[in-house]
UniProtKB/Swiss-Prot annotation:
GO MF annotation: an example: oxidoreductase activity, acting on the CH-NH group of donors
Protein's name according to its UniProt entry: tRNA 5-methylaminomethyl-2-thiouridine biosynthesis bifunctional protein MnmC
UniProt-listed Enzyme Commission number(s): 2.1.1.61, 1.5.-.-
UniProtKB keywords: Cytoplasm, FAD, Flavoprotein, Methyltransferase, Multifunctional enzyme, Oxidoreductase, S-adenosyl-L-methionine, Transferase, tRNA processing
Localisation: Cytoplasm
Species this chain originates from: Bordetella petrii (strain ATCC BAA-461 / DSM 12804 / CCUG 43448)
Catalysed reaction, written as an equation: 5-aminomethyl-2-thiouridine(34) in tRNA + S-adenosyl-L-methionine = 5-methylaminomethyl-2-thiouridine(34) in tRNA + S-adenosyl-L-homocysteine + H(+)
Cofactor: FAD
Functional note: Catalyzes the last two steps in the biosynthesis of 5-methylaminomethyl-2-thiouridine (mnm(5)s(2)U) at the wobble position (U34) in tRNA. Catalyzes the FAD-dependent demodification of cmnm(5)s(2)U34 to nm(5)s(2)U34, followed by the transfer of a methyl group from S-adenosyl-L-methionine to nm(5)s(2)U34, to form mnm(5)s(2)U34.
SUPFAM superfamilies membership: FAD/NAD(P)-binding domain (SSF51905), S-adenosyl-L-methionine-dependent methyltransferases (SSF53335)
Keyword Endoplasmic reticulum attached: no
Pfam family name, one: Methyltransf_30
Length: 628
């Protein structure tokens, strides 16, 4: 997944016979006899559903070829109508050519059966921007999840992490779209199969059946649907060897039944994101923190969450994109003040040459314009409502967040309890780990402990004898920085959107605009001072093309502000994942300046693993952030 390839939208429409057809592949999306009938006959009954999911806590389906999502809607509808349904239903679906949201909504209004129209509307409401990678959608209060994998199946499938109970193989015909029926893809899909996994497909070509046999499935024909004589069903051969367990699978096993309280050390953005993700799944959480909720962020009036883009769409860019999407999904429903404000971000470059390079990068990446687009100086100023030094790019999903309100909201969820104390050492016991303070007093105990206490995690690991196998974590260091509060009326009320570049300037909160931020290498304390305020005023001037008179008259050292610490790791990526040498211990630290980007994503990543759900990141990104 290291080589980037832009998504190509589908060209589709009705042919002369009234069939919904792909122009590119010259094939129909579903039988003229009806999409719902095909989904029920081929994919549900072909996989023994709903009978097979009864008596289970969760059931996971993997699909090739999402199309308009009619198979997913039929599956979801069957789950809703079954009193003996599993508590959770998960689908992972691969789609190389996703529809844009408006197109998906329009086509579903025409093609989804009346019985599915309500569900189709919910799907369209949550449909993500057409960006490469994984997108997790949640329905029914999180009981039904859909993980969309946008991109080429051959590139995505080796990196998916899930435990699959049933496969819906629904690509276009093998002679029209051979990529979705290649033996290598079948092997990659089979790698995720549970011991009793089944499959079903309308396809019955000999090459398809042989590829499935070679991948470890026992296949047979049975009557097809909509004029097709046969379809193919299969079951995983019991003799199929288990794939080697990776660190994430071992971590899931170490968690046991998945009901015991999880201990989280740290009550900042990292710990709060993990606590929320676990609490939403009904998991009890104990958060150990030396200070009160968000006390470290008292005075941190506002912060920005903006994705990163890179010409090669590198891991940092892909992770930041995933993180911003998870943050918006997770936090949008919080109470006013705690919920982020989707105001957008203008990202300005330092000079005309860099601006041209950024515009060229956008052209190469071909991201949808409703997610990010290039803007000239006049359009940028119009979006911000204030004069700006130059143009740049505009991210529609840029979020303005109030950390001092967000963190207590996340830690205040039902099922989360807080313990005041400073963790000093971890002690291994028979059924997990104990967290002790420096006096040896027990603060918490559990089979699963997550260290989310920023730079403090390094000392905790060292004093527990767990740091030596983690040379990158051993290089983590604390970096001080400060922000400055500027009166919004001095800039005509302040910018309407986030303005970033060499520093940032945020829309006003309670009348104050945040300008930031400084980086104090080697500082002994994090403090607000005249030098830092002068730096932040200079950064604001660089973004605006000069300071307004009211701000130019301000005296550095006399302004309100906030100072704090960043935990920084080499490579500018966080460390998130299980510790292979200490089963049951997890790390979520090194968020640096992007705590908002990693908070919800890391929380969902850890919680999904502990609860046996499909992971919301591909394996190469899991490896990029793995503690080491």
């Amino acid at each position: 997944m290291s080589s980037y390839s832009p998504l190509v939208p589908p060209a589709a429409g009705f042919d002369a016979d009234g069939r919904f057809r792909s122009v590119a592949y010259g094939d129909v999306y579903h039988s003229l006899s009806g999409a719902l009938g095909q989904a029920e006959h081929v994919f549900l009954r072909g996989n023994g559903l709903p009978q097979r999911w009864r008596g289970r806590q969760a059931f996971t389906v993997c699909e090739t070829g999402f199309g308009l999502g009619l198979n997913f809607l039929a599956l979801w509808d069957a789950w809703r109508n079954d009193p003996a349904r599993p508590r959770c239903l998960h689908m992972v679906s691969i789609e190389a050519h996703p529809f844009a949201r408006d197109a998906l909504r329009d086509w579903l209004r025409q093609l989804a059966p009346d019985i599915l129209q309500g569900l189709a509307g919910q799907l369209a409401d949550q449909w993500p921007a057409c960006l490469p990678g994984l997108h997790r959608l949640e329905f029914e209060g999180g009981a039904v999840t859909l993980t969309l994998a946008f991109g080429a199946a051959s590139a995505l499938a080796p990196h998916l992490r899930a435990r699959v109970d049933a496969y819906f193989l629904d690509g276009f015909a093998p002679d029209r779209n051979p990529e979705l029926w290649q033996p290598a893809l079948m092997r990659d899909l089979a790698r995720m199969a549970a011991p009793d996994a089944t499959l079903a497909t309308w396809a019955c070509a000999g090459s398809v059946r042989q590829a499935l046999r070679d991948a470890g499935f026992r296949v047979r024909k049975q009557p097809g649907y909509g004029g097709k004589w046969h379809m193919t069903v299969g079951v995983r051969e019991s003799a199929q060897p288990e794939a080697p367990a990776d660190a994430w699978a071992l971590a899931r096993a170490a968690d046991g039944e998945g009901q015991d309280e999880v201990v989280v050390v740290g009550g900042g953005l990292a710990g709060a994101g993990i606590a929320q993700a676990l609490a939403l799944r009904g998991r009890p959480v104990c958060v150990i923190d030396a200070a009160g909720p968000a006390s470290a962020h008292a005075g941190h009036v506002a912060a920005a969450l903006t994705p990163v883009i890179a010409r090669d769409d590198n891991p940092r860019a892909r992770l930041s994109r995933a993180g911003s999407q998870r943050a918006l999904a997770r936090w949008a429903g919080l109470r006013p003040g705690a919920a982020p404000r989707r105001c957008g971000t203008l990202q300005l470059e330092r000079d005309a040459g860099r601006s041209a390079a950024l515009a060229e990068t956008l052209q190469q990446l071909q991201f949808p314009a409703d997610w990010v687009r290039a803007v000239d100086r006049d359009e940028a100023a119009g979006l911000a409502g204030v004069p700006l030094a130059r143009g740049g790019v505009f991210f529609a999903d840029g979020l303005l967040v109030q950390p001092a309100a967000l963190i207590p909201a996340l830690l205040g969820m039902p099922g989360v309890r807080r313990v005041a104390g400073c963790a000093a050492v971890l002690r291994r016991v028979a059924h997990g780990w104990q967290v002790l303070d420096d006096a040896g007093q027990l603060l918490g105990q559990g089979a699963t402990v997550v260290l989310a206490n920023a730079f403090g995690a390094q000392a905790l690991l060292r004093d527990s004898g767990l740091l030596d196998p983690l040379p990158r974590v051993a290089q983590m260091h604390a970096l001080a920085g400060e922000i400055t509060l500027l009166p919004g009326q001095g800039l005509g009320g302040g910018p309407r959107c986030i303005v970033g570049g060499e520093g940032y300037l945020l829309p006003p909160v309670d009348g104050w605009c945040v300008a930031g931020s400084t980086y104090e290498h080697g500082a002994a304390t994090a403090r607000v001072g005249p030098a830092g305020q002068q730096t932040n005023l200079g950064k604001a001037a660089g973004l605006l093309g000069g300071l307004p008179a009211a701000w130019a008259a301000l005296a550095p050292g006399q302004l309100p502000g906030w100072a704090g610490w960043r935990a920084v790791l080499p490579g500018r990526l966080p460390a998130v994942g299980p510790l292979g040498h200490a089963p049951g211990v997890w790390l979520a630290a090194g968020y640096a300046s992007r705590g908002l980007s990693w908070s919800a994503l890391a929380g969902d990543l850890i919680a999904a693993c502990l609860h046996g759900e499909p992971l919301p990141l591909p394996a190469d990104l899991l490896a990029a952030v793995a503690p080491r």
